[in-house]
Amino acid sequence: MEFKIIAEYFDRLEKISSRLQLTSLLADLFKKTDKNVIDKVVYIIQGKLWPDFLGMPELGIGEKFLIRALSIATSVSDDEIEKMYKSVGDLGQVAFDIKQKQQSASILAFLGAQKASKPLTVEKVYDDLAKVATSTGEGSRDIKIRLLAGLLKDASPLEAKYLVRFVDGRLRVGIGDATILDALAITFGGGQNFRPIVERAYNLRADLGNIAKILANGGIEQLKNIKPQPGIPIRPMLAERLSDPAEMLSKVGNIALVDYKYDGERGQIHKAGDKIFIFSRRLENITNQYPDVAEYISKYVKGNEFIVEGEIIPVDPETGEMRPFQELMHRKRKSDIHEAIKEYPVNVFLFDLMYYEGEDYTVKPLSERRKKLESIVEDNDYVHIATHIITDNVEKLKEFFYQAISEGAEGVMVKSLAPDAIYQAGSRGWLWIKFKRDYQSEMADTVDLVMVGAFHGKGRKGGKYSSFLMAAYNPDKDVFETVCKVASGFTDAELDDLQKKIAELKRDTPHPRVVSTMVPDVWLTPALVAEIIGAEITISPLHTCCKDQYAEGGLSIRFPRFIRWRPDKSPEDATTNREILEMYKSQLKKIEEKPSDQSV
């Protein structure tokens, strides 16, 4: 398959903002895609070479590196390319302009008589970029530059534009996984009504390229039979949120299994024979950070093949008490993991089982999953079943909540024991409800928002970006809707570190998936997720979250404050617009229920 087909579609996709039109055009591209390379095409659309969970190297090509390769490919000096880049602000557009100019000149000089270069294929582009990513050791820099320059030399102007953008991590076509799923269902499944089948398959095996290839070659029937596979992560089940214990019990059917909600790193742990894989909430392979956890699971959880889920918690080695979540960050920074294990020991608290010895447990109710999980974990000091109770009593639920808080947990998770309480991979629903500590605010809980823009500071913070436009995720439209502008809660060190990240993410125009009426000093590609608390949720004409619900404007957080970064969450894992709406309605309900003051 020729790479120019992808480049031409990317050029058309970039000019469209309507999700329906994006989906239709993407489905058209998939119809023209060779079934043998559909997986590679999907990865390229996602802006990657392979799924994150493989732990394979990323391209990691800096702008200087790209400029050098483009210079070699076009015989234009590095200085001239840098000058053009400063003027245009898009290295992909610079590549297009240079190649276009050279192409026009060669046509005039040779009147079309020169021999055309062999067309670039998707296979060639993918394989060479894979070599660029994986090349290491002495001489690897020269190999990378040579490979990249070779591709750019053979590329047409349009191909060069999107090659450079892909390598630079700035594809700009505005397509998320949800839109890809829609297009796959239309192209190979027979229509949008088959989308739930495609999505469930993706939720059970979070490798969209692999799912696309199975669907393209085997059809919708083959996807129906997909089960979890150890080594490929399952997209995690997510919880709704409430602050009224009575309402929680009512939502889950009046009786619940209530777990501690631990303040740790959510880990999905797979065993396949003698291999252990640990995946983060974002489905990244974090096995190397937790070799001790891999050893504990191998030793104390019975079975040859299974997938379990739990929280990895830092603990005090002397008392066994839970330590703050932030201590886990030291494991990521330490070069000597064995030293980190001694300094920051962890325990694992398991709360679910999704697969065991060839059997798909995601389709079984929680009561059956938990019973099996308890039967396979041996008594030990490192791997535990999450502390829990089963109750139908509101007062007992409250008591257990305060017990959890006193022992260092964030709160509790209230889980349905109904016969249909399956593991809803990749979905947020009322089968699980989180009940977290009240932050002494009208907002009953924190929210996780995506940074989509930045504003210059004033006074002491002049010269820095010091306030930030934050957005919630709208899963129905696959877009990010603004909720607030946050400036407080950041330390000076956090702001300094943030300047570097902004430099990598900034863009001149809003990202195609960002819906905003507010215009920041610089737009950002949605990537960073932060935990935010505020005084209350109000309606504001400045913001777009749930703007279709209220004539006066969208929902906004008053007096927002930064709590911490959530590196474990992807932008699509952020708090949804529906959750913000539910929090707002719950807040109104509380206000209405408060007795009014009466004069005597």
Swiss-Prot record:
Active-site residues annotated for this sequence: 261
InterPro entries registered for this protein in UniProt: ATP-dep_DNA_ligase, DNA_ligae_ATP-dep_bac/arc, DNA_ligase_ATP-dep, DNA_ligase_ATP-dep_C, DNA_ligase_ATP-dep_cent, DNA_ligase_ATP-dep_CS, DNA_ligase_ATP-dep_N, DNA_ligase_N_sf
CDD domains: Adenylation_DNA_ligase_Arch_LigB, OBF_DNA_ligase_I
A single GO molecular function term of this UniProt record: metal ion binding
GO biological-process terms attached to the record: cell division; DNA biosynthetic process; DNA recombination; DNA repair; lagging strand elongation
Superkingdom of this protein's organism: Archaea
Protein name: DNA ligase
UniProt lineage: Archaea, Thermoproteota, Thermoprotei, Sulfolobales, Sulfolobaceae
Gene for this chain: lig
